[in-house]
């Protein structure tokens, strides 16, 4: 069964699409492996350094307030990178923007390695590898720990560009057919999480113990460079640069200075307008942005706190994240294999909302510190939470790509798909950037008030509020959003808004098509066109199966995974 599904899915794509998909998947795996090594190391490094600073100076711990600020600012700078994508992908090939972004990311990670080496940093001592003292990190570089914040923040610009563009490029590779997009998104997510799971476990079990978290991301610049080279080999995908109307009457230097700022806000405004003025998209805000916030806070906020304060070893947060990545892998796999059975993202998003409630066990969990098997237990419990999120994310991303591909021409200076994804991604980033430092400060307050590092401080009351209570609220909001789309009250709806998306499109719909892409008539037929093809409801790269003559090369393909149908 599995092999037949894989063969059928692979046969959906043309030879050129298969080549580009293979290059894209190899690049995304290289990128993800390097990313996991960097993100896991930097959070553990910051956690240890701030704890060590408090220990040496005999001061009150502000570890998770600072770690929250570190990750929050990184997310805020991702906002800039995400917004810049919408105008950039209309002026340069997507592969070029992606390659340059990931090269910039690798460069800034190399800067941090050089700073540590210049200030006297060393690899972890051999006698620390099997039994690391709880508060001895004297082998780290002698720089101000707050110096991590600006460097990590700047990497957020490149990170935000890469994370958003990888949600846009599948549409460029295979077009607007939702069947192809669902399969491609799921396929990419599967390999992405295979690499992410391997990267997380490799970082926690090999790189950090052998090198220390100040050098465990030494592989990141290498992997990022390899990913950039791989992505650059993708074909240009029929790219045609589009002329910028913003400040077009001004000299080049004025356009260069001001145009980016205006397009930044126009992109955000366009995405917000598309979302808030149409029922088709309003539910994406909680379904995508808030769900993504919950997933990221689980990995970047709760997992480090559990690893350091419950288990006594910040490096084990990567084991927990590895379990989360494995859940994402399984979730994406389920979407891949059941794409024809579950045709909308609604059931997956509802599953995601229910799985968030698993965190209720954390405030009542008392694992003995220093035993790695309890980190594995936490990883196993994070698996189903991320399973639900990944399944919803993959399916919802394909839905967004297919829907927005049909209204691209309504936007002038920015891509409609890029603008909507940028707005959703920016909303998540702003939410995370605001809440992460505040919740981190709350964790530190509870820890210090209950005794701190010297007197058995306990963060369980904080975990009750930032974990159990917060995630219950998120669950309710996400679950409620799944009842907004027309036709979503069914347990497994076959279609939303009576809109058929599993068809090919040649290009975006006409400006006067509006967003009302499939309006039912009183007689039960449909009057809306999905694309420019005349003579039928389903737009595409091919002519209508009802209009073309026998022997014509223009055959309508309704479900490309089932082959081409001739009249």
Placement of each model-derived feature along the sequence:
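C-terminal ends and interior cores of transmembrane alpha-helices
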Residues: 101-141, 353-372
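C-terminal transmembrane helical hairpin of 12-TM major facilitator-type secondary transporters
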Residues: 346-395
């Amino acid at each position: 069964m599995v092999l037949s599904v894989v063969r059928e899915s692979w046969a959906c794509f043309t030879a050129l699409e298969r080549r580009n998909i293979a290059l894209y998947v190899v690049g995304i795996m290289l990128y993800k492996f390097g990313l996991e090594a960097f993100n896991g190391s930097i959070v553990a490094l910051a956690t240890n350094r701030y704890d060590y600073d408090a220990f040496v100076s005999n001061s009150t711990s502000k570890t998770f307030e600072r770690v929250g600020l570190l990750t929050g600012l990184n997310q805020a700078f991702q906002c800039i990178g995400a917004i810049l994508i919408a105008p950039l992908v209309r002026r340069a090939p997507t592969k070029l923007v992606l390659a340059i972004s990931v090269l910039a990311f690798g460069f800034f990670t190399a800067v941090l390695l050089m700073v540590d080496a210049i200030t006297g940093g060393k690899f972890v001592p051999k006698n620390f590898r099997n039994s690391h003292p709880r508060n001895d990190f004297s082998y780290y570089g002698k720089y101000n720990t707050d110096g991590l914040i600006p460097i990590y923040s700047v990497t957020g610009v490149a990170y935000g560009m890469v994370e958003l563009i990888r949600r846009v490029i599948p549409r460029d590779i295979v077009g607007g057919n939702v069947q192809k997009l669902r399969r491609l998104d799921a396929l990419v997510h599967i390999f992405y999480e295979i690499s992410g799971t391997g990267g997380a476990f490799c970082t926690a079990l090999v790189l950090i113990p052998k090198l220390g978290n100040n050098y465990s991301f030494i592989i990141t610049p290498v992997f990022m460079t390899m990913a950039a080279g791989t992505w650059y080999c993708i074909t240009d995908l029929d790219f045609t640069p589009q002329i910028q109307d913003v400040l077009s009457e001004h000299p080049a230097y004025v356009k260069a200075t001001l145009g980016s700022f205006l397009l930044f806000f126009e992109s955000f405004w366009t995405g917000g307008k598309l979302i808030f003025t149409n029922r088709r998209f309003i539910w994406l805000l909680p379904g995508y942005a808030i769900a993504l916030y919950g997933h990221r806070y689980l990995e970047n906020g709760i997992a480090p706190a559990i690893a350091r304060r419950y288990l006594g070893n910040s490096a084990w947060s990567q084991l927990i994240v590895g379990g989360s990545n494995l859940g994402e892998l399984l979730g994406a796999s389920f979407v891949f294999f059941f794409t024809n059975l579950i045709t909308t993202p609604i059931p997956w998003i509802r599953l995601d909302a229910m799985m968030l409630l698993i965190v209720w066990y954390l405030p009542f969990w008392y694992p003995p510190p220093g035993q790695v098997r309890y980190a594995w237990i936490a990883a196993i419990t994070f698996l189903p939470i991320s399973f639900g999120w990944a399944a919803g994310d993959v399916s919802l991303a394909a839905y967004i790509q297919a829907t927005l591909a049909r209204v691209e021409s309504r936007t002038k200076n920015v891509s409609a798909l890029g603008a909507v994804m940028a707005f959703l991604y920016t909303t998540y980033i702003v939410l995370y950037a605001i809440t992460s430092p505040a919740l981190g400060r709350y964790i530190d307050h509870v820890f210090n008030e209950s005794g701190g590092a010297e007197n058995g401080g306990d963060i369980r009351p904080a975990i009750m509020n930032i974990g159990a209570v917060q995630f219950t609220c998120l669950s309710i909001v996400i679950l409620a959003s799944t009842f907004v789309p027309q036709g979503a009250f069914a347990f497994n709806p076959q279609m939303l808004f009576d809109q058929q998306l599993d068809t090919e499109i040649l290009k975006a719909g006409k400006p006067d098509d509006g967003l009302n892409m499939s309006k039912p008539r009183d007689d039960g037929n449909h009057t809306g066109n999905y694309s420019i093809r005349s003579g039928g409801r389903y737009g595409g790269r091919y002519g209508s199966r009802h209009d073309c003559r026998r022997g014509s090369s223009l055959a309508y393909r309704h479900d490309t995974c089932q082959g081409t149908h001739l009249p």
